[in-house]
UniProtKB/Swiss-Prot annotation:
Pathway: Cell wall biogenesis; peptidoglycan biosynthesis. The gene is murG. UDP-N-acetyl-alpha-D-glucosamine binds at T11, G12, G13, N120, R161, S188, Q286. Disulfide bonds: none annotated. This is UDP-N-acetylglucosamine--N-acetylmuramyl-(pentapeptide) pyrophosphoryl-undecaprenol N-acetylglucosamine transferase. CDD domains: GT28_MurG. It is an enzyme of class 2 (transferase). Pfam families: Glyco_tran_28_C, Glyco_transf_28. Keywords: Cell cycle, Cell division, Cell inner membrane, Cell membrane, Cell shape, Cell wall biogenesis/degradation, Glycosyltransferase, Membrane, Peptidoglycan synthesis, Transferase. Its main location: membrane. It comes from the Bacteria.
């Protein structure tokens, strides 16, 4: 049985796509997972896959710290090279993050092929610096290729959990009725300002007969103040839901940040959206992520603004009072974002 090493660490944006891809392989490959101690993968990976932890850090900080971490990176790369030979790894799949750099360099030392996946429209630092040392770079958003001229790239899309691909009925706690269903995903980063914008237009949405599910994120105290929810049966406010696949598959409109994870979930569920990019995202990558969906008419971009302004309110009102939502849904249905896992597997098969 061929052996695949998955190097994914740190945030959900790196780990969840890798987990989704690993799960799609069934039992056809033996999988070894390379991560970092005390990060999210320690909670998510061991119950399914053999996790090997390696100490490595970024190159941030003062000159001494950067030099120290550079030495750790070189040492970790040698460790990875030895590990690859010991485990008889055939190919590496990595999704970025701290662990990607030593994995790519270690693979280069050991002569093992590497497929690097980049989810964002603007590649991260590791992808920009080390993508040229990989056999192939798979892209979640096609415009990222503009920044990777020296790399062999293919647009594959970003893997998502199987639940997003299945038809699902709405959770029982979602308001019933014929009104337009709007799902608001505040996200974990920078959600407070976006939630304030949405909270300001809730009376307008309710007045127009909409059903609203507002997922605020756990870092916002808004979800603790549920006076509005108590006053209207068509509004549900929660900090979090593990039933997002069902919500998006049934939603008429989503209002969301535009991180790579949100983009691929909206794409595979064919959900029209209003995207509010997080203005402090690295390299403003959320703006370009959003531009990808807006370019083919699947989304409208609204920049973060003072809730007292009527920008978001006017855009939502125009959507609800015209055929625009129907046209956006048609655009989403006509845009191909299918089978990312299959496309990635085909590349792995070709380079291994």
């Amino acid at each position: 049985m061929p052996r695949l090493l998955i190097a994914a660490s740190g945030t959900g944006g790196h780990i969840y796509p890798a987990l989704s891809f690993a799960d799609s392989l069934s039992n056809s490959w033996e999988i070894v997972w390379l991560g970092v101690p005390h990060r999210l993968e320690v909670e998510l990976v061991p119950e399914k896959y053999n996790l090997i932890k390696l100490k490595v850090g970024g190159l941030q900080g003062n000159s001494f710290r950067k030099l120290f971490n550079l030495c750790k990176l070189l040492f970790a790369s040698v460790q990875v090279s030895v590990l690859l030979r010991q485990k008889k790894i055939n190919v590496i799949f990595t999704t970025g993050g701290y662990i990607s750099a030593p994995s790519i360099l270690g693979a280069k030392m050991a002569g093992i092929p590497v497929l690097l996946h980049e989810s964002n429209a603007i590649p991260g630092k590791v992808t920009r610096l080390l993508g040229r040392f990989c056999d192939h770079v798979a892209l979640g958003i096609p415009s990222a290729s503009e920044y990777l001229q020296r790399c062999r790239t293919s647009f594959t899309g970003t893997p998502v959990r199987t639940e997003f691909l299945l038809e699902k009925s709405l959770p029982s706690w979602v308001p019933l009725g014929e009104g337009v269903l709007i799902v608001v995903m505040g996200g974990s980063q920078g959600a407070i300002k976006m939630n304030e914008m949405v909270r300001k237009i809730l009376p307008c949405l309710i007045e127009k007969g909409c059903r609203v599910v507002h997922l605020t994120g756990k870092n916002d105290c808004f979800y603790r103040n549920r006076d509005q929810e108590k006053n209207h049966p068509n509004l549900v406010v929660r900090d979090f839901s593990d039933e997002i696949p069902a919500l998006l598959r049934n939603a008429d409109l989503a209002i969301s940040r535009s991180g790579a994870g949100a983009i691929c979930e909206l794409m595979v569920t064919k959900t029209p959206s209003i995207l509010i990019p997080f203005p402090s995202s690295t390299d403003q990558h959320q703006e370009l992520n959003a531009a990808y969906m807006a370019r083919f008419g699947g989304a409208i971009i609204v920049n973060q603004h003072d809730p007292e302004k009527n920008i978001l309110k006017n855009i939502v009102s125009n959507l609800l009072d015209s055929n625009s939502l129907r046209e956006m849904k048609l655009n989403m249905n006509n845009h191909d974002y299918s089978y990312p896992e299959k496309k990635i597997f085909e590349i792995i098969h070709s380079i291994s």
